[in-house]
Amino acid sequence: MDRPALPKSIKDKTNPWGPIILGILIMLGGALGKGSPHKVFNLTWEVYNQEYETVWATSGSHPLWTWWPTLTPDLCMLAQLAKPSWGLSDYPPYSKPPGPPCCTTDNNPPGCSRDCNGPLTYLTPRCSTAWNRLKLVLTTHHLNQGFYVCPGPHRPRHARNCGGPDDFYCAHWGCETTGQAYWKPSSSWDYIRVSNNASSSDATTACKNNNWCSPLAISFTDPGKRATSWTSGFTWGLRLYISGHPGLIFGVRLKISDLGPRVPIGPNPVLSEQRPPSQPEPARLPPSSNLTQGGTPSAPTGPPQEGTGDRLLDLVQGAYQALNATSPDKTQECWLCLVSSPPYYEGVAVVGPYSNHTTAPANCSADSQHKLTLSEVTGKPLPRKGSQDPPGPVQYHSGARQKYSLSGGSRGTMWACNTGLTPCLSTAVLNLTTDYCVLVELWPRVTYHSLDFVYRQVEGRTRYQREPVSLTLALLLGGLTMGGIAAGVGTGTSALVKTQQFEQLHAAIQADLKEVESSITNLEKSLTSLSEVVLQNRRGLDLLFLEKGGLCAALKEECCFYADHTGLVRDSMAKLRERLNQRQKLFEAGQGWFEGLFNRSPWLTTLISTIMGPLIILLLILMFGPCILNRLVQFVKDRISVVQALVLTQQYHQLKPLEHGRAIVK
């Protein structure tokens, strides 16, 4: 039997470009994973007990590391599942305060125990009854008692002798960094400050009503606002300054929720969407009402998804309609060409109004195209810079820096930053970073050519008297949002037509940007799929060279490892899809009732345009007809009176006057 031919050498099958491709994947993964610092997340600050169970939380939509609220949990909430001395060792979180309530002289609730107004004993304060919680309130608000807080594992090296959780991190004096005590403990490096959040009288009233009555106020210090490990949480110990120094453990952590699921690996669908513009469908005959025997009605199918050709054609058509509505003289004989090489969009800087918000509005929650950047911005901008920028010709808005706020531009505008496009700016991020942002209108790269230029191109002339000038749509329509439309309010039909044409172009731009986002997502999937193939080949080669210690040992080279950063990309794109849908809903909700009427009823446009002319003429006749008729009748009457006077005067003769001094004798 013949021996089978040996396969080719492994070296011949190994792609020499494999390490280079792997390095490019790592670089692209890291670049795509970097998001905008102004991106809005759903943040939740949680306070947990010693069992790491959340006992209090507050949520909000803000950029990362810009929202530092005051946390107000109750002291007895922190004692849930703590040591038995607190009386809540078996009490689950988020439960109502346990009873029984206190007895009063005016009203004794059923099952009450002890008189709330009676003298308190020196028993250890607990949280199991209203009377014990009242004792705890008087302890925490007492001038010579109170409580103190010691940091956990995040403390510096010189504080390592402060003990562990068994000592509540307060094994020695001097370990405390904050609290409510007569010596006012403080620190310059700890992350929080803790104090009482209610006066003694208010807390006493809440205790007598059988409620939680020992609220704390946990605020963040400057070192705490600079820390970026809040997602894993930090722990502290709290002890009462009374006999025995009872204590408990609590912690604070930040939860970033609403992260999208993992994207499955599959084929690249980018090329499948490269379709030419769709042709108009021919008119179809109405289906017969009689179904064939055994037949079933077909399920209605939705409209097919637009391809690349349709989206590009929509951009050109929207550009023409907007240009024709604003400058009809420029569209008599011209060519509008969509630029096929990047950059595909350009910004026109505008000086327009923007609003500040303490919470993220709907349009700010739209995680718009942070992966897209602008290489060209024209016009006179309204810039905003971070506080760490070098001095330059920029307008600082100091009023917005006094507290956290989000600056959102008017409709149709976006902020172009060095980190990408964003609908809103976080003033807290600007204070901490060196970002530079400009309020711009976004326009597609559509060049405007006159008819002579096209003729010269067709005739094949290669020599020009001067360099041909190509105007872009941004130069022709720049400032339409802040200038043309804003100034055209109240000018009648012309402003309404311009607004409608601009809205159509704006909708086409948003649709194209959405597809660009989808292409970036598909590119990220392709990179992940390619990295999986490369890693599988690497594992296969390691198995083949297992006797020699693996591929790296056989090649006598250093081993390379792949770090996958595409998880952040998947999370960002999932948020981006959700917020693009919110932006589309906001765009539809912003239309007036007049525009919405035409959008909901297409036949209404033809009907109104048909009957509007005769209806206006009829209204004019009804308004001015009686006046004109009265004037005509009055004119006829005047002419008739003159004719009657002439007829009467024809029957008489004028008498000659008598001479002076002559008498008539008969």
Swiss-Prot record:
Record motif CXXC, residues: 334-337
Record site: Cleavage: R466, E467, L646, V647
Residues carrying covalently attached carbohydrate according to the record: N42, N197, N290, N324, N356, N363, N431
CDD domains assigned to the protein according to its UniProt record, in alphabetical order: HTLV-1-like_HR1-HR2
Gene Ontology cellular-component annotations: host cell plasma membrane; membrane; viral envelope; virion membrane
Any Gene Ontology biological process: symbiont entry into host cell
Segments of this protein annotated with the region Disordered: 265-310, 378-399
Positions of region (Fusion peptide): 469-489
Disulfide cysteine pairs (residue numbers): C76-C127, C102-C116, C103-C112, C150-C170, C162-C175, C207-C213, C334-C337, C334-C560, C364-C417, C424-C437, C552-C560
Modification note: Specific enzymatic cleavages in vivo yield mature proteins. Envelope glycoproteins are synthesized as an inactive precursor that is N-glycosylated and processed likely by host cell furin or by a furin-like protease in the Golgi to yield the mature SU and TM proteins. The cleavage site between SU and TM requires the minimal sequence [KR]-X-[KR]-R. The R-peptide is released from the C-terminus of the cytoplasmic tail of the TM protein upon particle formation as a result of proteolytic cleavage by the viral protease. Cleavage of this peptide is required for TM to become fusogenic. The CXXC motif is highly conserved across a broad range of retroviral envelope proteins. It is thought to participate in the formation of a labile disulfide bond possibly with the CX6CC motif present in the transmembrane protein. Isomerization of the intersubunit disulfide bond to an SU intrachain disulfide bond is thought to occur upon receptor recognition in order to allow membrane fusion.
InterPro entries, alphabetized: FMuLV_rcpt-bd, TLV/ENV_coat_polyprotein
Residue numbers covered by motif CX6CC: 552-560
Pfam families, sorted: TLV_coat
Binding site for Zn(2+): D115
Extracellular face residues: 34-607
Motif position, YXXL motif: 652-655
Cytoplasmic domain ranges by topology: 629-666
Biased composition, class Polar residues, residue ranges: 287-299
Assembly and oligomerization: The mature envelope protein (Env) consists of a trimer of SU-TM heterodimers attached by a labile interchain disulfide bond.
Function: The surface protein (SU) attaches the virus to the host cell by binding to its receptor. This interaction triggers the refolding of the transmembrane protein (TM) and is thought to activate its fusogenic potential by unmasking its fusion peptide. Fusion occurs at the host cell plasma membrane. The transmembrane protein (TM) acts as a class I viral fusion protein. Under the current model, the protein has at least 3 conformational states: pre-fusion native state, pre-hairpin intermediate state, and post-fusion hairpin state. During viral and target cell membrane fusion, the coiled coil regions (heptad repeats) assume a trimer-of-hairpins structure, positioning the fusion peptide in close proximity to the C-terminal region of the ectodomain. The formation of this structure appears to drive apposition and subsequent fusion of viral and target cell membranes.
Entry protein name: Envelope glycoprotein
Species per Swiss-Prot/TrEMBL record: Hortulanus murine leukemia virus (HoMuLV)
